[in-house]
């Protein structure tokens, strides 16, 4: 099946896994998805991730974090820039997610990074998603 938006598929798999408290989810591998998983791990939204190599595409196994009781570590993930409507921002226009409680992930000329890192390094780019 041809997938129109693989990043939205990744975010949906993580969102659904968190909601039903799965220990892990598998996602088809790509470099961009691996970078997004690295940022989610560094920011504390997921426990870990592992790249599983195969002779075809491979996969990224994401180990999810869960809070106490009904509390979630990831409340929601929102795709911002889509294949049909790209959203870009300059270095001074990077939006804050829920007053600084969440993060946004940007694809910049210096690689994939959070909005805070992009503002600190002085680069703008395409807003991939928001996580809170």
Residue ranges and their predicted role:
Residues 1-132:
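Core subunits and conserved enzymes of cellular information-processing
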